[in-house]
């Protein structure tokens, strides 16, 4: 009888210990995921702010008479087109204007000039309309589904956008959520 009571106590204590460890581990994973997500948010916001600063430099050069506005815009677009971030250089930025026209996209140059007002993801999310709302609010994050660089895979993406007022440009970048969770 004592042996059975001792065995039962050990089993109960073991189960409690395992339960505690599992809860602790889940809490640590959730904290890590939150930290990683905060890091991604900070990364994409920082990249956009860097791009806006570069665009601002070209704008100032046009205002000073060093470049025409068109020359400044073309140079700014080409610099932003070449900008990459992330270890694998998968991070890039694109520019829409406030009339919803694609100004520059390094992966989809054939779509430049197209109006994207009605661009909608598979869940009915109006991608560019939401991006514009965030940019109009001083900058912000959006989530939507978009085709990956392979041209086939559609995956959820988290993006950050800000507006460059003098040229009515909205600069955006984002990361695919599944790429972020793979790292976690």
Positions of the model-derived regions?
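A short beta-strand signature within small-molecule sensing/ligand-binding domains used
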Residues: 91, 128, 151-162
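Amphipathic coiled-coil signal-relay and dimerization helices
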Residues: 101-107, 154
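Short, hydrophobic beta-strand elements of compact beta-sandwich sensory domains
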Residues: 156-183
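Extreme N-terminal signal-anchor transmembrane helix of membrane signaling/transducer proteins, especially
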Residues: 1-24
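Membrane-interface helix-start motif
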Residues: 29, 36, 178-184
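Short N-terminal helix-loop-first-beta-strand/juxtamembrane motif that initiates sensory/input modules
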Residues: 42, 81-102, 139-141
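Extracytoplasmic/periplasmic sensor domains and loops in membrane signaling proteins
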Residues: 66-79, 108-149
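Juxtamembrane membrane-water interface segments immediately C-terminal to a transmembrane helix
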Residues: 19-52, 63, 67-70, 74
């Amino acid at each position: 009888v004592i042996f059975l009571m001792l065995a039962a106590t050990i089993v109960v204590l073991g189960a409690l210990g395992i339960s505690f460890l599992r809860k602790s581990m889940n809490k640590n994973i959730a904290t890590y995921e939150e930290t990683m997500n905060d890091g991604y948010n900070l990364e994409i916001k920082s990249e956009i702010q860097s791009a806006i600063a570069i665009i601002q430099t070209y704008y100032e050069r046009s205002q000073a008479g060093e470049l025409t506005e068109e020359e400044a815009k073309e140079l700014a677009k080409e610099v932003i087109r070449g900008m990459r971030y992330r270890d694998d250089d998968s991070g890039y930025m694109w520019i829409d204007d406030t009339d919803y026209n694609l100004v520059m996209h390094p992966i989809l140059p054939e779509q430049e000039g197209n109006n994207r007002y009605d661009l909608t993801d598979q869940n009915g999310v109006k991608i560019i309309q939401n991006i514009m709302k965030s940019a109009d609010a001083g900058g912000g994050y959006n989530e939507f589904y978009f085709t990956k660089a392979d041209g086939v895979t559609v995956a959820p993406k988290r993006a950050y956008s800000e507006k460059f007022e003098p040229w009515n440009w909205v600069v955006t970048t984002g990361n695919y959520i599944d790429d972020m969770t793979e790292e976690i």
